[in-house]
């Protein structure tokens, strides 16, 4: 289908499902709304707007369904009724012909499939818009037979994606220029985010690298299993990983009858997430029930099994500090500190007044404290902060929006397993440990150790550099020599002060830790 024909199809779907009312209601051009009313005269729309939007996206195909799923995570931009409805979108499409999958594998490895796998199940076990999964058996480097899951990219996806994305970018430009809410909704930003998301999913080597990183990070935590990646069998269009066997986490009664401790399972999920966030700064960002199973094997009984690593989040130390300090300030009801943190982040316009931002944050956050602490949703706290920040033109970073979406998923899953789950009591030790690591002597020692090779490299060179400098200067220029010696003395005094001050600081912290237990509040 040509781009023009596809554009006509999209316009027809928009009018059929009444999305013109949803979009044009904020347009500043009265004539545009008038023309649309004439075209759609006599149309009856009974369904709510969120349902109509969901059905329209489903009718436009899998790429638009995925776009709706991404929109559902941007609750800082979307009204709640629309975000809730879009969250119901399912990325389910009929599987493509197994012969096509086999041809893709043979093209990737340049040999017959019988030489790649010991056996290959033609019937796919899962299918989505981007890829489908088959089970197979390989021989690893040691010659052992291993059961694997083979993810094969759906052929011909890139041209379709690029065509639909070009239309989305064009429509986003129209909305941003014509709508009164265009700048606030940032449609171009959302489409660009979706563009990156889709192209990341199209690279299965990238997904394999994500899985390998998570597996390495989680090796010391006996709560979660990450499948092994078989790199000899991976390609941009084919991903081969260890086959994992477990029970889907939403089959709670089956897990309970098997003897799994359900409340512990809920707490373990939160522990896994906060370990990935605050210890590793690298987290699985697609933690919906379809990607999580629970092992019933005797040696790994009750552990989580994570699947599908196409979407991950990465946090810097600055991001982690922003999160930790915002959460702790929120639970202290220190709204001024929350406002200051937003301004210190550098994401706020320079003219923003702290007291105005503080008042807005107080208005949004204070009602939470009418309920028990265990009922407070950390994901909703972040969401409300982001929504308030948007009013002040704060540029919320994409990785934090991704984290907020994942946190909401984790909370929802945890409370589905255990309605009495106290998320804050589980998260608090991670925040305390992270704050202690940032403020305590461990951080100073880490920084000194990290810089030691640099100091060791330059210190032996200082006498030679000084000698070379003096030789290059005229012998009668004693003023420069005196100035250099004076500077050297000042530098020596400064270094001594830093060393003595650092030792005093470390000793003071050690004494403080002996007599005072460090707590957030």
UniProtKB/Swiss-Prot annotation:
It is a single-pass membrane protein. GO terms for molecular function: ATP binding; protein kinase activity. Residues 119-497 form the Protein kinase domain. It is an enzyme of class 2 (transferase). The active site is at residue 286. Its EC number is 2.7.-.-. ATP binds at residues 125-133, 151. Belongs to the ABC1 family. UbiB subfamily. NCBIfam families: PRK04750.1 (NF003404), UbiB (TIGR01982). This is Probable protein kinase UbiB. It comes from Acidovorax ebreus (strain TPSY) (Diaphorobacter sp. (strain TPSY)). The gene is ubiB.
